[in-house]
Amino acid sequence: DRDKLERSLNVALRKRPVQAEQIEQLVSRITRQLESLGETEIPSSTVGDFIMKALKSVDEVAYVRYASVYKDFRHTGDFARFLGDEGLDEN
């Protein structure tokens, strides 16, 4: 669902320096990638992986925000491990 995809990206990118046009481009790119799989039903985990990859290339803060929900972080240690695993703990 394109609208749900756009809402997810908007939540992650809220108050970040990313223009509405960039978000629309992300939605289009992810939608094309998902359609290219040729499947009628796509697991939410696959959609989440595509969103994570797109966000990482655009805004690391939005990437971590999305990951915190998608990967169900419960404690600060979850954030720390994720940041370390992704090599994002140095800045």
What are the residue ranges of the model-derived segments?
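Long, C-terminal-biased catalytic regions of enzyme "large/alpha" subunits
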Residues: D1-N91
